[in-house]
Design a protein with these regions (language model features):
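Intrinsically disordered, low-complexity segments enriched in serine, threonine, and glycine
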Residues: 294-296
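Conserved ATP-driven motor cores of ASCE-family P-loop NTPases powering translocation/secretion/packaging/pilus
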Residues: 183-185, 189-286
Length: 383
């Protein structure tokens, strides 16, 4: 789901539709197959993409040879055996077209190998993981980032782990499946979630109305600079109202009368939020049983201690180099290594197809179960 919904944001609110679920199910079947095949040594996203682009007659034959995958492929097999070629081609194209945008030697390099595990709050192997997007390829890389995020969430949201934080800036640039559940449940597992974005309307546009509302209403702490429109109104309503006194003075020829009344007014009006100066923020914070905060709502200027920041920056340690992509003579071989890895993945995918088709052809019982003919009486391949 994470991969396909990041590549097709319009599908987020169409989950359950036939032509939305079909490509998701097909990709899931391929990934599950790669997990089964040879104990998962080829279970990577690039290998899944390459297999998806192989002839569907070979792919479906191989996948259906595994009983645990038959139910995944039922919609495709019905169309294939019923000669509904237009429907079948549409189902397959719905998966192929978005995923082919992710075919890239650089992306394949990053998404293969076993450099480290993603359980960042493992007490035995704690880690800091920092990933970034590329504005030029935002729609493509957001799928990869979303995949990593969804996997990390499942690994870190457990008991008996170190406390950790998931910090995401420009949240709408990626679709983070399960984010609402993470916010709601992770606190008990010492996981803090920090989300940064420009405006609520961005979140609604990219996550859909329902999911956006859940995220907005689940967070306990909120900090906001200058925002306008519906976002300012929403924040003003969230901060609530306060009973305020109002004095009115009436003057006529004979006397002056003064009246004082009280009424509920917005604690921080939307107009004030829309005109905040740089460095000035409004917000609300949550407290704990043993750490009560009387004034939870604030409107203040954040004073930055530049001296402390400078001292902290001077104490930074350089990030160690894991791979400098140089040969023994100091020559840069980055592109050669990346291209070699790309070619190897393609070769792996073709080798899987060849080996599996040979296995099926040499197994008469399996051939019969799959309804395959003996290829005009040819003997099984002994190679």
């Amino acid at each position: 789901y994470t991969i396909m919904l990041n590549l097709n944001r319009t599908w987020i609110e169409k989950q359950g539709d036939f032509f939305v679920e079909s490509p998701i199910i097909l990709l899931a079947a391929i990934i599950w197959y790669l997990k089964i095949y040879k104990n998962g040594i080829y279970c990577t996203f690039p290998h899944a993409v390459e297999l998806l682009n192989k002839p569907y007659s070979d792919l479906f034959t191989i996948l259906t040879s595994y009983p645990e995958l038959e139910n995944y492929l039922s919609p495709f097999m019905d169309a294939w055996k019923g000669n509904a070629q237009d429907q079948l081609q549409g189902q397959i194209a719905s998966a192929k077209i978005p995923l082919t945008r992710m075919i890239s030697p650089q992306l394949y390099w990053v998404m293969t190998g076993n450099d480290f595990s993603l359980d960042i709050n493992n007490p035995k192997e704690p880690k800091l993981l920092c990933v970034g997007n590329n504005p030029d390829r935002q729609n493509i890389y957001s799928a990869a980032l979303g995949l990593y995020n969804s996997r990390i969430v499942k690994l870190i949201n457990k008991k008996k782990q170190l406390k950790c934080a998931v910090i995401i800036d420009e949240l709408p640039t990626i679709y983070f499946r399960g984010l609402d559940n993470l916010i709601a449940t992770a606190r008990s597992n010492k996981v803090g979630v920090l989300l940064g974005f420009q405006d609520f309307s961005q979140l609604t546009r990219d996550y859909g109305e329902k999911e956006s509302k859940v995220i907005q209403n689940t967070v306990g702490n909120i900090f906001s600079g200058q925002v306008v429109g519906e976002t300012a109104k929403t924040l003003s309503e969230r901060f609530g109202k306060v009973l305020q006194q109002r004095q009115s003075v009436s003057i006529n020829r004979q006397d002056v009368s003064t009246s004082i009344n009280t009424q509920l007014d917005s604690l921080i009006p939307a107009s004030k939020i829309a005109n905040l100066s740089q460095g000035t923020f409004v917000g609300a914070v949550a407290d704990n049983f043993d750490e009560r905060i009387e004034q939870k709502i604030f409107h203040a200027e954040i004073v930055v201690d530049h001296t402390k920041i400078s001292a902290e920056e001077k104490a930074y340690q350089k990030i160690p180099v894991i791979n400098d992509f140089k040969d023994r003579n100091g020559n840069d071989i980055m592109m050669q290594q990346i291209q070699r890895n790309y070619d190897q993945i393609k070769a792996d995918a073709q080798a899987i197809i060849n080996e599996e088709m040979r296995r099926i052809k040499n197994d008469p019982e399996l051939r019969k179960r799959l309804g395959l003919e003996d290829e005009k009486g040819k003997k099984p391949d002994k190679s």
